[in-house]
C-alpha cells in the first residue's frame, strides 16, 4: 500500500480538523469527497508531509515520514497540488515546471524531457514560453497540475484540481487521472460529486473530520436508493444520504 493511515488526528488549537481517520490505498484513483470544512485539505496536507499528525500512525510509500531522511525520500516520489499554489508571475510555464522538477531533485539530464511531457499532458504546449502573469485562471491551474506530475510520482495528491477548468478541460483532466491511476496512487480532494463519479475507482467521504464512507462510486450510489436524499443524480443522492445518516448518528450519540 502506498498510503497507510491508522487513527490519525490533526488539531489546530482546540479544533480537531481530522478526528481518528483510518485509510489505506494502493495504485488507482481515490476521490476524497466532502463538504467544505470536512477536513479534506488537512488530511491531504498530512499525506503531502506538509504538516504532521497530532496522533496516530502514517506510512507513505512504505516509509515513515517522521524521520527527515525518510520524508525526503517520500517527497522525491510525491506530486502535490495544494488548493492555493504560489505562482511566480515572471516565470514562463516551462521555467515554473522546471523549478519544481529541480526542487524534487530529479536527475538533471532528464529534466527537460520531463518538463515537456508534463506540459504536453496538461495541454499547455502552446503556452510553454508564456509568462505565468499572462495566463487565465484555468491555465494557471493546469500549470499547477503540470508541476505535480513532472516527476512521474508514485503518490499524487490534488486538492480541488478542477477549480477554474472549463468543461472540456475537466473531461481531459479526468482522462489523464485515469491513466495516472494505472501505475500510481492518486488522491483527488473535491466537493464536486461529478468529478468523483467520472474519474475515481474508490471514494472516501469525509464529514466533520471523519471518514463516514469508503467504497466504490457504485456503492455510494446505492446508499441513496429508496431515500428522499437531495441530489439531481444518483451519486449525488447517495452522497447526501450518507452525510445525513452520519450526522443523525452523531446527533443521537450526543
Regions found by a protein language model. Give the residues of each.
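Helix-to-loop junction immediately C-terminal to a conserved catalytic motif
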Residues: 48
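Conserved ABC transporter NBD signature motif
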Residues: 56-74
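Conserved ABC ATPase "signature" region
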Residues: 98, 102, 109-127
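Conserved ABC ATPase signature
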Residues: 131-138
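Catalytic Walker B motif of ABC-type/P-loop ATPase nucleotide-binding domains
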Residues: 156-160
Amino acid at each position: 500500500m502506498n498510503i497507510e493511515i491508522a487513527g490519525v488526528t490533526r488539531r489546530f488549537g482546540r479544533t480537531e480538523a481530522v478526528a481518528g481517520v483510518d485509510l489505506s490505498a494502493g495504485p488507482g484513483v481515490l476521490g476524497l469527497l466532502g463538504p467544505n470544512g470536512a477536513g479534506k485539505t488537512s488530511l491531504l496536507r498530512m499525506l503531502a508531509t506538509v504538516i504532521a499528525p497530532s496522533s496516530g500512525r502514517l506510512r507513505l510509500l512504505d516509509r515513515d515520514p517522521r524521520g527527515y531522511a525518510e520524508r525526503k525520500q517520500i517527497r522525491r516520489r510525491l506530486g502535490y497540488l495544494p488548493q492555493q499554489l504560489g505562482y511566480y508571475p515572471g516565470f514562463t510555464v516551462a521555467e515554473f515546471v522546471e523549478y519544481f522538477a529541480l526542487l524534487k531533485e530529479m536527475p538533471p539530464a532528464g529534466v527537460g524531457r520531463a518538463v515537456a511531457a508534463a506540459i504536453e499532458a496538461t495541454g499547455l504546449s502552446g503556452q510553454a514560453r508564456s509568462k505565468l502573469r499572462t495566463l487565465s485562471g484555468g491555465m494557471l491551474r493546469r500549470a499547477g497540475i503540470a508541476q505535480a506530475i513532472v516527476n512521474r510520482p508514485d503518490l499524487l495528491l490534488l486538492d480541488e484540481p478542477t477549480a477554474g477548468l472549463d468543461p472540456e478541460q475537466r473531461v481531459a483532466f479526468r482522462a489523464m487521472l485515469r491513466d495516472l491511476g494505472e501505475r500510481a496512487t492518486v488522491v483527488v480532494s473535491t466537493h464536486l460529486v461529478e468529478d468523483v463519479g467520472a474519474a475515481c475507482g474508490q471514494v472516501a467521504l469525509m464529514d466533520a473530520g471523519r471518514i463516514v464512507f469508503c467504497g466504490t462510486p457504485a456503492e455510494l450510489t446505492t446508499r441513496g436508493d429508496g431515500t428522499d436524499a437531495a441530489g439531481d443524480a444518483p451519486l449525488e443522492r447517495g452522497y447526501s444520504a450518507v452525510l445525513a445518516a452520519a450526522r443523525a448518528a452523531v446527533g443521537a450519540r450526543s
